[in-house]
Regions:
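Bacterial N-terminal signal peptides
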Residues: 12-23
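N-terminal secretory signal peptides that target proteins for export/translocation
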Residues: 1-8
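Subset of outer-membrane beta-barrel
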Residues: 29-437
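Short, flexible coil/linker elements and helix-boundary hinge sites characteristic
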Residues: 9, 23, 296-298
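Sec/Tat signal peptide C-region and signal peptidase I cleavage site
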Residues: 24-28
Length: 437
């Protein structure tokens, strides 16, 4: 869900803050084996206003008729961080908070059981401020997650005697991981007539804490358990650039072309390694028996790839919009301390549109924005060297809180409903995801 308004409502701000912390607290329920690879599952990188349109956004600027009755240039009240060039059209101070509620269903091939989980996460929090409406300059500040790591995998096996081949003991191996990555950013957009240019810059940081715990199961012999744990932290400055070109293609129809680029970057990192034997205490906590090996603050690099995209929208004044994006990510360049992971370069196609029956009509549902879209493309993660086909279909609504023509305190609640699938019946794991934003 998304709320945007002029910031003059302390009660609403308090409510949104509470929702922010509730979303963070609920994150612990997520469990995705896919997030073991790369730097985890990528979070949707679009504002909720466009998620209902398949996640388009590179050529997106919403039209606000309060500031442009001649439809000469787009005038926006949506903070579209996907393309910072769109900031230049921002005409009101906007506070924007997005959060998701997700339902995950994970099924393993040839296994009837399935894993289910429901959890909530914060999508982003940002503030957009027009610096000069006349000169079309605006800036944005925000914080958003880029990826999430949450998994807990248990594997039971039988150990065999290497000489006789007979079964000796059972073992339980637990693979666990937490972490993710985030961007704290500031952005600036400036329009030069039909051309808008923009950039986002700030601090990109993250952590990955993963371990393998091995437990021999034997009723008569006591074995210490083994823990192999690694924690990596990285951080550094990043830069994203964007451009949009807007032109009329009819008396009340506009075309916007857009492009974005984020370049390959090496980030400084620190790594801690622990190899130890342990036992569990009465409350399930770990009690170290012997530290076999330990190494702290090992310096290195984490390399994130360049990502590039192009897109367009065509909009009929106060009526409809259609658009598409195409993006590529050079994930073959991804490295952690020089090591390649189970990832590969990927692409994604997004298509969507929206329709407003009567933007200034008396009927409320006529002023609602209705959205529909889909996206398709392989995930950047490879599971058992298998390409994970991925698609999402989406439906969205823009719910006006007040009629725009009667108030400068224009609030809008955007809802997005998405159904996504990663993998299929031929891959080792298939994941279905239902998301309410």
């Amino acid at each position: 869900m998304r709320l945007v308004s002029v910031i003059k409502r302390p009660v609403a701000q308090l409510l949104l803050t509470v929702l922010l912390f509730c979303g963070i607290a609920a994150d612990a329920q997520e469990n995705s084996p896919y997030s073991r690879y790369g730097w985890g599952n990528l979070v949707p990188s679009t504002p909720i206003a466009t998620r209902g349109m398949g996640g388009i956004g590179i050529g997106y600027v919403d039209y606000d008729p309060r500031y442009d009755f001649k439809f000469q240039y787009p005038k926006s009240q949506t903070v579209n961080f996907l393309n910072p060039a769109s900031y230049s059209r921002l005409k009101i101070t906007s506070f924007d908070l997005g959060f998701d509620v997700e339902n995950q269903i994970l099924r393993e091939r040839n296994v009837t059981e399935k894993y289910k989980a429901t959890y909530a996460n914060v999508s982003y929090i940002q503030l957009g401020v027009p610096l000069s409406r006349k000169r079309n300059i605006a800036m944005v500040f925000g914080l958003r997650p880029i990826s999430r790591i949450n998994y807990n995998i248990r594997n039971y096996t039988r150990e065999l005697n290497p000489v006789t081949g007979n079964s000796i003991d059972s073992t339980l191996t637990i693979y666990e991981g937490t972490g993710g990555s985030y961007q704290a950013y500031g952005g600036l957009g400036k329009a030069f007539g039909k051309l808008s240019l923009g950039l986002n810059g700030g601090y990109f940081f993250g952590t990955k804490d993963f371990s393998t715990k091995k437990n021999f199961i034997n009723d008569s012999v006591l074995y210490y358990k083994g823990n192999y744990q690694t924690k990596i932290n990285f951080g550094g400055l990043f830069l994203q650039t964007g451009a949009q070109f807007s032109t009329k293609i009819g008396s009340s129809t506009r075309l916007v072309l857009g492009a974005t680029a984020s370049f390959k970057k090496d980030f400084n990192a620190k790594k801690n390694l622990v190899r130890e034997t342990f036992e569990y205490d009465g409350s399930g906590g770990i009690v170290t028996k012997d530290s076999v090996y330990e190494e702290k603050d090992v310096a290195g690099k984490v390399t994130f790839p360049g990502t590039y995209g192009a897109g367009f929208t065509i909009e009929k004044e106060e009526r409809w919009m259609i658009g598409a994006d195409y993006t590529i990510g050079n994930w073959d360049d991804f490295r952690v301390y020089g090591q390649k992971d189970s990832v590969a370069s990927n692409w994604k196609l997004k298509v969507g549109g929206q329709f407003v029956p009567n933007a200034f009509g008396a009927n409320y549902w006529g002023r609602v924005t209705y959205r529909l879209g889909f996206n398709y493309g392989p995930d950047y993660i490879r599971y058992n060297n298998e390409e994970l086909k991925q698609y999402t279909v989406s439906l969205g609504f823009g719910l006006p809180v007040r009629p725009a023509r009667f108030s400068n305190q224009y609030s809008n609640i955007n809802l997005g409903f998405e159904f996504g699938r990663r993998g299929n019946n031929n891959t080792a794991l298939k994941e279905n995801l239902f998301r309410l934003s």
